[in-house]
Amino acid sequence: MILYHGSNLFIEQVDLQKCRPFKDFGRGFYCTEIKEQAEQMAKRVAYIYGGSPCVTICELNEEAFVSPEMNIKTFRKYSHEWAMFVLNNRNRDFTEFNRVDCNHDNKYDIVPAQLPMMI
């Protein structure tokens, strides 16, 4: 599976410590299957933080989605569960990390959803 990441710099290796916290699916490396979406994000990030728009192309082995070693949280549609997950991840005061409806602690390796995918 080919994925795209829009930023203001080329990403050689994912480093979660460089990823911003309190995003929809938690701190992570957000990607999309839609190249144009990544291009728009790259322009936005470059406008906000400076630099030049850059789209990093990533390849994800689809076997990762069925690997028992991966902890995956899937949202098949927008729902109350999805909304609470996003709300809790955006909440800087949220501290109940053991709950399944948050990813502050990066318990989920992949969160595929209708929005950009976090890996």
Regions found by a protein language model. Give the residues of each.
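Ordered hydrophobic segments in well-structured contexts
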Residues: M1-H5, F29-C31, C54-I57, D109
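Glycine-rich loop/turn
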Residues: M1-F29, E36-Y47
